[in-house]
Design a protein with these regions (language model features):
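Ligand-binding pockets and gating/stacking loops
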Residues: 1-257
Length: 257
């Protein structure tokens, strides 16, 4: 039995290595001009590939090109059939989206990292006729407030001291988690193009003031676009587990094409 199991494992590994999905992971097969379109302006594809192939941690330090290569890989995988793909900018303490100082400058840099790759992914999938059956969701787990952390006259560890007159970008912290509003982008998958749903206040605290969306409704909208009932549940130990919270999610029909 153990020998048969081992042989089956080798057979499965051989099939996987020779499958279209395995070839999709080989980004060296992609024309250089295509790779460039997925990278921020000025980022050298050769340098990014060299970092990816190194063993000295260079790729872990490479930030500008990683998300772009992830989007390129996502497009290649969409062409061969995987049903669920995740691309992330990754969590690195006090870096990237963890904006504990220079928040507005950091946000501008992060937008530079994700802007071209996301746009090119959408364009490529549309050109290949894959966008109408692919739902692209760009989201984060929470928003940030636009002021520095802490309360007046209360000390916060390693807090940037903010003068009465702000003259330096580092004083814009964008520290605090903010749950009263946020933004999610949806592309393809049966959703409208160029459509804006909801509105936030013009002044702080910039809460949602029109068409608020609860997380279970966002999930229901995504499932509905994919042809899955938001009330679908699976029974585990005689208890129903719903794909949306308690099966209460309702699709936002206004965003559907």
């Amino acid at each position: 039995y153990q020998r048969e199991s081992l042989i089956r494992s080798f057979d499965n590994a051989h099939r996987l290595l020779n499958s279209p999905a395995a070839k999709a992971f080989d980004l060296s097969l992609e024309p250089v001009e295509n790779v460039k379109r997925y990278l921020p302006a000025g980022v050298d594809p050769a340098r990014t590939f060299q970092a990816a192939q190194s063993r000295d941690g260079a790729y872990e330090r490479e930030t500008l090109g990683r998300f772009g290569l992830g989007c390129l890989l996502a497009r290649r995988l969409c062409e061969v059939g995987p049903r669920y793909i995740v691309v992330t900018t990754e969590y690195i303490p006090f870096l990237n989206w963890d904006t504990h100082e220079n928040g507005h400058t950091r946000a501008a840099d992060m937008k530079r990292q994700i802007d071209a790759p996301i746009a090119q992914l959408v364009l490529d999938l549309e050109e290949r006729g894959l966008l109408n059956r692919t739902l692209i969701v760009v989201a984060s787990e929470f928003s940030r407030d636009m002021i520095t952390e802490g309360k007046p006259e209360k000390t916060v560890k390693d807090q940037v001291e903010v003068p009465e007159k702000i003259e330096d970008l580092k004083h814009y912290g964008m520290h605090r988690h903010f749950t009263d509003a946020g933004s999610v982008l949806l592309f393809g998958g049966g959703v409208k193009k160029g459509f804006l749903y909801g509105r936030t206040a013009e002044e702080r605290p910039v809460k949602t003031i029109e068409n608020p969306v609860h997380i279970e409704d966002l999930h229901a909208t995504m499932y509905s676009a994919l042809g899955i009932s938001p009330k679908l549940s699976y029974e585990i130990e005689r208890r129903p587990f719903y794909v949306t919270r308690d099966g209460l999610g309702k699709p936002i029909r206004d965003v559907m094409a």
